[in-house]
Amino acid sequence: MPKTLIFGHKNPDTDTICSAIAYADLKGQLGVETEAVRLGEPNGETLYALEAFGVSTPRLIEKAANETDRVILVDHNERQQSVSDIDDVQVVEVIDHHRIANFETADPVYYRAEPVGCTATIIKKLYKEHGLDIPKPIAGLMLSAIISDSLLFKSPTCTEEDRQAAKELAEIAGVNAEEYGLNMLKAGADISDKTAGELLTMDAKAFAMGAATVEIAQVNTVDINDVLARQSELEKVITAKINDNGLDLFVFIITDILENDSVALVLGDKTAAFEQAFQTTLTNHTAVLKGVVSRKKQVVPPLTEAIANVN
């Protein structure tokens, strides 16, 4: 039997990469042959974490069915966010912390989803449930994932379970979570060498919202104006993405990791739904979103509801 591949979503973030690696370690300790792989290039933040704990970057795959018939999804479940030939393989497990949408299987599946801030928090619990030890590098990667998804425990998605898991993982990894976390986030916020196209795909996800197709990209920075200075260039790339991919709306969330606020750059036919969702008026295609840092909890739910209500 070919080994089972474990991967997160396209345009991978730190949780997607690190949780795939961690879950592959857990399954290996249980005697199951798996391999963590990735569906895109890791960002600077993720590379910082991998280097800090001496772990190799998983290999890149474009398709899965040419080498296995069984896959495990972490940090996502929506098909449009997954490997391109997801319909040609059997999803045997899902470990996730997002909404469930556009997902079905022909066979029974082990599905573990919890309303926590990070997939790694769930995997930490699975190690405990199976009575397994967490290796130091794996603990460091799972800590990195929690710090990333919670913006160093400041995001509204962060739960007490996430904080407790991070505390225990930091002890195993032998690091100070606050100090290490800030350095990691700053590494990810250094986007000076990124093209407009790279900024818009570093952390982008497609969503089916009713009959509408929406893409929401997000980038972390320490100065929003540095990103907005490139607005004209960004809008050209966004317009091309809308036309090429048949999108109804593209939302680019630029998040200040120091102030915990965001600015959204919004284009497409459904901009009225965005304005309704956030009770705002777009000015030059942008809107300030005070206190908004989480795509999952603060952007997707109100936008999904608004699109359903706006013609």
Curated annotation (Swiss-Prot):
<keyword id="KW-0378">Hydrolase</keyword>
<dbReference type="InterPro" id="IPR038222">
    <property type="entry name" value="DHHA2_dom_sf"/>
</dbReference>
<keyword id="KW-0464">Manganese</keyword>
<feature type="binding site">
    <location>
        <position position="13"/>
    </location>
    <ligand>
        <name>Mn(2+) 1</name>
    </ligand>
</feature>
<dbReference type="Pfam" id="PF01368">
    <property type="entry name" value="DHH"/>
</dbReference>
<dbReference type="GO" id="GO:0004427">
    <property type="term" value="F:inorganic diphosphate phosphatase activity"/>
</dbReference>
<feature type="binding site">
    <location>
        <position position="75"/>
    </location>
    <ligand>
        <name>Mn(2+) 2</name>
    </ligand>
</feature>
<dbReference type="InterPro" id="IPR038763">
    <property type="entry name" value="DHH_sf"/>
</dbReference>
<feature type="binding site">
    <location>
        <position position="9"/>
    </location>
    <ligand>
        <name>Mn(2+) 1</name>
    </ligand>
</feature>
<feature type="binding site">
    <location>
        <position position="15"/>
    </location>
    <ligand>
        <name>Mn(2+) 2</name>
    </ligand>
</feature>
<protein>
    <recommendedName>
        <fullName>Probable manganese-dependent inorganic pyrophosphatase</fullName>
        <ecNumber>3.6.1.1</ecNumber>
    </recommendedName>
</protein>
<feature type="binding site">
    <location>
        <position position="97"/>
    </location>
    <ligand>
        <name>Mn(2+) 2</name>
    </ligand>
</feature>
<dbReference type="Pfam" id="PF02833">
    <property type="entry name" value="DHHA2"/>
</dbReference>
<comment type="similarity">
    <text>Belongs to the PPase class C family.</text>
</comment>
<dbReference type="GO" id="GO:0030145">
    <property type="term" value="F:manganese ion binding"/>
</dbReference>
<feature type="binding site">
    <location>
        <position position="75"/>
    </location>
    <ligand>
        <name>Mn(2+) 1</name>
    </ligand>
</feature>
<dbReference type="InterPro" id="IPR022934">
    <property type="entry name" value="Mn-dep_inorganic_PyrPase"/>
</dbReference>
<feature type="binding site">
    <location>
        <position position="149"/>
    </location>
    <ligand>
        <name>Mn(2+) 2</name>
    </ligand>
</feature>
<dbReference type="InterPro" id="IPR001667">
    <property type="entry name" value="DDH_dom"/>
</dbReference>
<dbReference type="GO" id="GO:0005737">
    <property type="term" value="C:cytoplasm"/>
</dbReference>
<keyword id="KW-0479">Metal-binding</keyword>
<dbReference type="InterPro" id="IPR004097">
    <property type="entry name" value="DHHA2"/>
</dbReference>
<keyword id="KW-0963">Cytoplasm</keyword>
